[in-house]
Amino acid sequence: MIRELDTVVLAHDLEAYGLTQGDVGAVVHCYKDGGTFEVEFVTGEGTTIAVLTLSQHDIRPMYAREILHVRALAETEGVD
């Protein structure tokens, strides 16, 4: 079960936002339907890349034995 403030992992690429499968975000809101979430993705310095409405099929919980990985954010049009 995914809850507010959980760390989650993106299940597939979202090219329009420069996000790739495996990127890590934080759940900032859970909708009442239990399967839709607002997820914030940030840079290592804390700058918000995107806050997106995603379904339970777009994200998964981060597991205790997983480790974070760093990569450069791709340039995208229309995304600051």
Task: Please annotate each region the language model reported.
Residues 2-65:
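Basic/aromatic-rich interaction segments and small domains that mediate binding to polyanionic partners
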Residues 64-80:
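Long, low-complexity intrinsically disordered regions
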